[in-house]
């Protein structure tokens, strides 16, 4: 059974890196102390893989996990196949997915997660769990072979969702961007995840975690609000 924790971002309000996620992760990984976590660092454009690995290790030290970045393997895929848990960090979703294709990780991750290996990711790491990355917020844009992602959660995800416009901002709001996406892709569902929220996926059900509701948009911007602590079939 699929077991995934998809988190909107690495911070919430003024919290330090990944601090607000620790209670979720402690429960999610309660049976995995001392186990090996394969960490995918490809989204970290402004830091090296070594630096990203160290940052995550330090942030999650209290969970007592063995975190190993996939770049430590002769073949990056080897680390995935040896892992007890898979984690994908945030950053640039285009760079992340491009390198996942280059290192042939998508099928390996899908197979592991579909057979029950826990998966957690934040920001870009949540985005790639969805059907495609076409509702990412990111620049720079690089070109993966396809925008199709892991499709472990078979809908679109928009992390870091913020409603409305800042005063003086004359560009499109996030709602307007998603409306445009749904005009072009009317059969899609988009799960808009505000800061401080997460989806815990267990099999074919999802539970909303965090401080705010998650918004599900469909054709013509029809809204289905997924309330905090609610569980729904997706």
UniProtKB/Swiss-Prot annotation:
<feature type="active site" description="Charge relay system">
    <location>
        <position position="123"/>
    </location>
</feature>
<dbReference type="Pfam" id="PF03575">
    <property type="entry name" value="Peptidase_S51"/>
</dbReference>
<protein>
    <recommendedName>
        <fullName>Peptidase E</fullName>
        <ecNumber>3.4.13.21</ecNumber>
    </recommendedName>
</protein>
<comment type="function">
    <text>Hydrolyzes dipeptides containing N-terminal aspartate residues. May play a role in allowing the cell to use peptide aspartate to spare carbon otherwise required for the synthesis of the aspartate family of amino acids.</text>
</comment>
<dbReference type="InterPro" id="IPR029062">
    <property type="entry name" value="Class_I_gatase-like"/>
</dbReference>
<comment type="similarity">
    <text>Belongs to the peptidase S51 family.</text>
</comment>
<keyword id="KW-0720">Serine protease</keyword>
<keyword id="KW-0645">Protease</keyword>
<keyword id="KW-0963">Cytoplasm</keyword>
<feature type="active site" description="Charge relay system">
    <location>
        <position position="160"/>
    </location>
</feature>
<dbReference type="GO" id="GO:0006508">
    <property type="term" value="P:proteolysis"/>
</dbReference>
<dbReference type="InterPro" id="IPR005320">
    <property type="entry name" value="Peptidase_S51"/>
</dbReference>
<dbReference type="InterPro" id="IPR023172">
    <property type="entry name" value="Peptidase_S51_dipeptidase-E"/>
</dbReference>
<keyword id="KW-0224">Dipeptidase</keyword>
<dbReference type="GO" id="GO:0016805">
    <property type="term" value="F:dipeptidase activity"/>
</dbReference>
<feature type="active site" description="Charge relay system">
    <location>
        <position position="138"/>
    </location>
</feature>
<dbReference type="GO" id="GO:0005737">
    <property type="term" value="C:cytoplasm"/>
</dbReference>
<dbReference type="GO" id="GO:0008236">
    <property type="term" value="F:serine-type peptidase activity"/>
</dbReference>
<keyword id="KW-0378">Hydrolase</keyword>
């Amino acid at each position: 059974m699929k077991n995934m924790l998809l988190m909107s971002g690495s911070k919430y309000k003024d919290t330090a890196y990944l601090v607000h996620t620790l209670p979720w992760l402690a429960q999610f990984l309660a049976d995995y102390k001392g186990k090996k976590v394969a960490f995918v660092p490809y989204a970290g454009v402004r830091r090296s893989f070594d630096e990203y690995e160290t940052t995550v290790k330090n942030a999650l030290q209290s969970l007592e996990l063995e975190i190993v970045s996939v770049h430590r393997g002769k073949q990056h895929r080897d680390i995935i196949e040896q892992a007890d848990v898979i984690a994908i960090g945030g950053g640039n979703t285009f760079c992340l997915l491009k390198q996942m294709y280059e290192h042939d990780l998508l099928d390996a991750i899908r197979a592991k997660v579909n057979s029950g290996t826990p998966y957690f990711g934040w920001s870009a790491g949540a985005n790639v769990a969805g059907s495609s990355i076409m509702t990412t917020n990111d620049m720079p844009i690089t070109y993966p072979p396809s925008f199709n992602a892991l499709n472990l959660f078979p809908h679109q995800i928009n992390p870091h969702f913020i409603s409305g416009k800042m005063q003086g901002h004359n560009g499109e709001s996030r709602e307007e961007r998603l409306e445009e996406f749904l005009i072009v892709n009317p059969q899609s569902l988009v799960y808009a995840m505000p800061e401080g929220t997460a989806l815990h996926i267990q099999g074919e059900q999802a539970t909303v975690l965090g401080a705010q509701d998650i918004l599900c948009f469909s054709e013509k911007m029809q809204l289905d609000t997924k309330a905090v602590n609610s569980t729904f079939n997706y």
